[in-house]
Amino acid sequence: EGESITVADGVLWMRLPLPMALDHVNVYALDDGDSWTVIDTGFDTKKTREIWEKLLVGPLAGKPVGRIIGTHYHPDHIGLVGWFMQRGAAFSTTRTAWLMTRMLTLDPHAVPTPETLAYYIQSGMDPEEYTARRTERPFNFADCVAPIPLGYTRLKEGQTITIGGRKWDIRMGDGHAPEHATFWSRDDNLVLGGDQLLPSISANLGVYAAEPEADPVQDWLLSCERFKPYATDNQLVLGGHKLPFTGLPLRLHQM
């Protein structure tokens, strides 16, 4: 806790805990000279904030966090964006991630919505489980995501962005989360993959009540095909979970 590993010049890899079977999320800090850019943030929990406080006076000491980049809208990646923004950091992410995060944090529910209950039935939920869930408080996004103030910088497919003294091409993936941003360095062999590019586990491809006819598997497969022309064996992929890895062409084929 409160420690980092240097994985490339000016690139720090840090790990934050998650209260689930997949018990961690990877976050990264890239040296922008007079400040840091942080890629993803972890959940908004007391424990995660405490770890960040250690990181800010430890490996990141001496310069502020000037920018947060969110790869996608899931709470383990975007949970503390608002906390960093209150400390002066700017926020960059895709429009879809921004809108989903704002919408979900402002839309808590004490019990499942009628649409969610109908989706449970449509999906064949066990009757006993359905009866129990009807009156249970569901997970709410705001349970582990700090409120995000208005104002962000949009990331788009095909853009070039400078982070940590490198120029990166932004390429979007889908399936795990809509408009998931990945970053491919033009200056060395680094790729920031978020949950779109993972080494030894498959990203969750979920269908939810908000879009019950979605086909995330098709979205995922199309994304893998789009990435293949840019993948090389020597790229070091820094993903959202597990370990950094090489051999991206084979991994895209496996996924």
Predicted features and spans:
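Conserved beta-strand hairpin/beta-sheet module of binuclear metal-dependent hydrolase folds
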Residues: 3-63, 183-199
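Short Pro/Gly-enriched beta-strand edge/turn motifs at strand-loop
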Residues: 7-14, 137-144, 164-166
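Conserved HGGG/HGGXW glycine-rich cap/lid loop of the alpha/beta-hydrolase fold
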Residues: 15-18, 77, 172
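Residues at the C-termini of beta-strands that transition into short coil/loop
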Residues: 15-17, 95, 241
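Short, charged, surface-exposed secondary-structure boundary motifs
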Residues: 24, 100-106, 201-205
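Metallo-beta-lactamase
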Residues: 36-46, 141-153, 160, 167-253
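Active-site HxH/HxHxD metal-binding segment of metal-dependent hydrolases
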Residues: 44-48, 53-161, 189, 254
